[in-house]
A protein has these predicted regions:
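Bacterial N-terminal signal peptides that target proteins for export
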Residues: 1-9
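Bacterial N-terminal signal peptides
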Residues: 8-18
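Sec/Tat signal peptide C-region and signal peptidase I cleavage site
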Residues: 19-24
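N-terminal, Lys/Arg-enriched amphipathic/low-complexity engagement segments
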Residues: 25-71
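Short, structured beta-strand/loop micro-motifs enriched in basic residues and often containing a Trp
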Residues: 31-41, 72-79, 263-271
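Glycine-rich anion/phosphate-binding loop at the beta-strand->alpha-helix junction
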Residues: 101-106, 111-114, 118-119, 123-141, ...
Length: 455
């Protein structure tokens, strides 16, 4: 039987007053977001608001593996507290310009894993259960290092929900330009100082994964740092774990046997902030749907690097300082985010036409008496779903609705002038295509797209 979470009238009033206070406060040019949360939605407290054109400086903790091994958290991620944007209403959009991503951690750890079957109820990321006393999301304490160091405060049993099957620890150089895998003797020393090496912020909620002393991979593997943000965007229109705010994870909440369960109809209320797209990095712009009043900008799950697909399931989570410039776009109704990546990150077919290419195309048009569509610029639509096919379908449908054309036409545009790229397995993708600038003008995003690709 599906469980329904009811919010008492007093609690609901307090939550509404909290949001109203944020929205009624004088808008600020700069807002600092340091408080950490594991669940977001309409009941979330918001800070701010920040002005359109203002700056958000967020300091998220290492937030995938850390929350996964922190039983009291109801999510596989954490994010910084939602920031309201002045004037943002449902049906608007908010552009987030990523100005700076500064890695703060000195080391990180990651790997592949399996869930331990008797230590969760339905979802090992959400409803973590102590195998001895049966408490769901039990309070815990740290005793030493390693996989059995995190123990239930009620009964003393080890209670993390995951077993790492192949893990590694990565140590960064001074300027955070690269990392190197290290041997067991070094990971043991890092584990003893895990909070310092991971640079867990003072308001962090998670245990640092570096305390597990993971060293299955050979030492000496060099990994280039190209920091990106795995979970950034707006607050969804239903309360949910921060980790599950994308179609390939929201689906696991439908009819789930725990308190964070949602209905099938609720899936569309996600905002797809948890993209894990490696091109969401310094210099990129993400245009996000507003699904609750104020928008509620959240930042988390910063990675030191990530290959397309994140096929290990996780990557190198780090503490970071993220600087965003915010721009409100009135009346742009989106179902999911639009990404404007850095010019060099665009698919080959979506790059700006050269003068020579335009001239050659116009010669063909002149010869046969038709005009060439030369005034085109690229956009990427995020699609998500339980698997890659459904994610692509989602992205295509979202693009079709945005542009007022058929999905079949989108498929042809994408095939000729863009491409589909994998953000995360099993189901987050980017759908890229060239779009007439006149249409971008009509949508109100032409200045942003021109700023990104014609500067």
């Amino acid at each position: 039987m599906r469980r329904v979470v009811c919010i008492g009238s007093v609690a609901l009033l307090c939550l509404l007053l909290g949001l109203s206070s944020a929205m009624a406060a004088e808008a600020q040019k700069i807002v600092f977001a340091s408080e950490i949360v594991d669940v977001i939605g309409p009941s979330s407290k918001m800070i701010g608001p920040v002005q359109s054109g203002g700056i958000i400086i967020a300091t998220p903790e290492p937030a995938c593996y850390g929350p996964m091994i922190t039983p009291q958290l109801r999510s596989g991620h954490t994010q910084t507290i939602p920031v309201a944007v002045e004037g943002a209403k449902v049906g608007d959009a908010i552009a987030l310009k990523i100005k700076k991503v500064r890695v703060l951690s000195k080391a990180t750890a990651s790997g592949t894993e399996i869930a331990i079957k008797d230590r969760f109820v339905g979802d090992p990321f959400v409803a973590k259960r102590c195998p001895k006393c049966g408490t769901v999301n039990p309070p815990t304490e740290l005793k030493g290092t390693g996989a059995e160091a995190i123990r239930c405060k009620i009964c003393g049993a080890p209670c993390i929900t995951f077993q790492v099957t192949n893990g590694y620890t990565l140590l960064f150089d001074e300027d955070r330009s690269l990392g190197v895998t290290v041997p067991k003797a070094v990971t043991d020393e890092i584990a003893k100082q895990a909070y310092e090496y991971s640079a867990v912020p003072t308001k962090g909620l998670s245990y640092p994964v570096t305390l597990l002393s993971l060293a299955d991979m050979p030492p000496g593997i060099i990994a280039r740092v190209r920091a990106m943000i795995g979970n950034m965007g707006t607050t969804p229109a239903i309360d949910m774990p921060t980790s599950h705010n994308a179609g390939d994870l929201t689906c696991f909440l439908v009819g789930a046997p725990h308190k964070m369960a949602i209905t099938k109809a609720d899936e569309a209320k996600r905002s797809d902030a948890h993209m894990d797209i490696d091109n969401v990095r310094e210099g990129a712009i993400v245009i996000c749907p507003v699904k609750v009043a104020g928008g509620g900008i959240v930042v988390g799950d910063v990675h030191a690097m990530q290959g397309d697909g994140e096929i290990s399931g996780h990557t190198t989570d780090v503490s970071a300082e993220v600087t965003l410039e915010v721009e409100l776009i009135k009346g742009l109704k989106l179902e999911g985010p639009i990404l404007l990546p850095n010019k060099e990150d665009l698919p080959f077919l979506a790059k700006e036409y050269t003068a020579d290419q335009l001239q050659r195309a116009r010669s063909i048009g002149d010869k046969f008496g038709f005009a060439v569509l030369g005034d085109l610029l690229p956009i990427q639509m995020i699609g998500s779903g339980p698997n890659l096919n459904e994610a692509v379908g989602c992205g295509v449908d979202r693009m079709a609705k945005l542009l007022g054309i058929t999905p079949e036409a989108v498929k042809n545009w994408v095939t000729m002038t863009g491409g589909v790229e994998i953000g995360r397995l099993p189901g987050v993708v980017t759908v890229t295509m060239m779009v007439p600038v006149a249409k971008l003008q009509e949508l109100g995003i032409a200045p942003l797209v021109k700023e990104q690709y014609l500067k």
